[in-house]
From Swiss-Prot:
Any one cellular-component term (Gene Ontology): mitochondrial inner membrane
Highest taxon, organism lineage: Eukaryota
Species assigned in the record: Saccharomyces cerevisiae (strain ATCC 204508 / S288c) (Baker's yeast)
Alphabetic keyword roster: Glycoprotein, Ion transport, Magnesium, Membrane, Mitochondrion, Mitochondrion inner membrane, Transit peptide, Transmembrane, Transmembrane helix, Transport
Protein's name in the database: Mitochondrial inner membrane magnesium transporter MFM1
Gene behind this protein: MFM1
Length: 413
């Protein structure tokens, strides 16, 4: 039993009232069905607004995820592909007892607040429980139960879910039409194939969007490199890495399934219901089905890895360019420092010549010219020597670095 949170502080009453007005507009139907006069005690009107808001949000959250009621929202499809009703709530105990499941099998379905990155496919005595991206379903030889994936952003009332249900109905009906031929695969494999098609089409759409955005950013970086573009590229690289991880997990799941012959044989639910026993290697249909989508997922993984490699290569090139620019700025600063040092030699001679001391150098007619020439010569000599040494450092190559390391190793020995 989930406890309600405490009443929020009184100092935020005006903010809560504004939030309540927005909530009433969004969830007016939910608020109107709740009898506040019987459920809530009479308190301060401002505190009442905050309490009503919290009560409504908690009730809405419990309604979506079935907390406290022990039921799971789902859609039932019979052997002919017809839905028994648009929305059914099944008790957790009924799912476990009637369909031969274990209580831990429903953990992902009940607690799926977010997208499950790790897909799973469990084969039981007379059912297949699959959790693949946004689709969570229980497949039987004559029935399919599709669970609500509200936590992943796709609810039973969404257009994406309705399209998926329509595709599932069409495949399960298995009637030959002008657009679709009759499928010789058994009932459970047709349902499984529909789930794979839906999941992989979502992966493909997401991949196309990510690749298009990344390609545009990389092309823009060829003309100008700005901080905003680099920050945006970093965000896209994170999204690509997350997408690649998701695709790799789907591929790994298919790899594990293809390596387990006993599980592949157990997936023939229709044959098991009819009493037909499959031998260890008699699973050609399901193996070909899984290999087809394994190759498709592998192609998605390869494309995403190629895009990630392109982004990393671009980042390395940008780092090289930025390092080169930084080195040029450092060299410019060193040249200015060498110039100031060489100029200091001339100033030193001039300062000695200008001291208010008796040196009798002023009596010579060539003293000023001599000091000036010596100052210029010292300035040019110091600057040339510094620049020559700087050029030697710039011409240092990898081969010279290896030779230097070899000499140091020989000296140590």
């Amino acid at each position: 039993m989930r406890a309600f949170p405490r009443v929020l502080p009184f100092r935020h009453q005006r903010s809560y009232n504004n939030i309540l007005l927005r909530t009433v507009r969004l969830f007016g139907s939910s608020l109107s069905s709740f009898d506040f006069s019987r459920q809530m005690p009479k308190v301060d009107p401002d505190n009442t607004a905050a309490m009503l808001l919290q009560k409504n949000l908690i009730q809405r959250n419990n309604m979506l995820y079935g907390y406290g009621s022990g039921t799971i929202r789902c859609t039932l499809l019979d052997s002919t592909g017809r839905a028994k009703s648009p929305l059914v709530e099944i008790k957790r105990e009924d799912l476990v007892s009637k369909h031969g499941l274990l209580p831990r099998d429903l953990r992902k379905i009940e607690k799926s607040r977010k997208n499950d990155l790790v897909p799973s496919l469990l084969v039981r005595e007379n059912s297949i429980l699959i959790s693949l991206l946004t689709v969570k379903a229980l497949i039987k030889p004559d029935m399919v139960i599709i669970f609500d994936s509200a936590g992943s952003g796709i609810t039973l009332n969404s257009e994406a879910h309705k399209d998926f249900i329509n595709d599932m109905k069409l495949r399960l009906k298995n009637q030959e039409t002008s657009e679709l031929n009759s499928d010789p695969l058994p009932y459970e494999f047709r349902a499984l194939e529909t789930i794979f098609i839906s999941a992989l089409s979502n992966l493909t759409s997401e991949m196309k969007v990510l690749l298009t955005i990344c390609k545009g950013v990389l092309q823009d970086l060829e003309f100008s490199i700005t901080r905003d573009k680099l920050r945006f590229l970093l965000g896209q690289n994170k999204k690509l890495s997350s997408f690649n991880k998701k695709a790799v997990l789907v591929k790994d799941m298919l790899d594990d399934l293809l390596e387990q012959d006993d599980m592949l044989c157990d997936m023939y639910l229709t044959d098991k219901k009819a009493g037909k026993i499959r031998v260890q290697d008699d699973h050609t249909e399901i193996e070909m089905l899984l290999e087809t989508y394994h190759n498709y997922v592998d192609e998605i993984v390869q494309k995403s890895e190629s895009a990630i490699s392109d982004v990393k290569t671009t980042e390395e090139i940008i780092n090289i360019i930025l390092d080169s620019n930084r080195n040029e700025l450092m060299l410019l600063g060193i040249r200015y420092a060498i110039g100031m040092l060489s100029l200091g030699g001339a100033l030193f001679l001039g300062s000695i010549y200008g001291m208010n001391l008796e040196s009798f150098i002023e009596e010579s007619n060539y003293a000023y010219l001599t000091v000036t020439i010596l100052g210029l010569i010292s300035t040019v000599w110091l600057y040339a020597k510094g620049i020559r040494h700087l050029h030697k450092l710039q011409r240092m190559t990898l081969l010279s670095k290896i030779k230097t390391d070899s000499v140091h190793e020989l000296l140590k020995k």
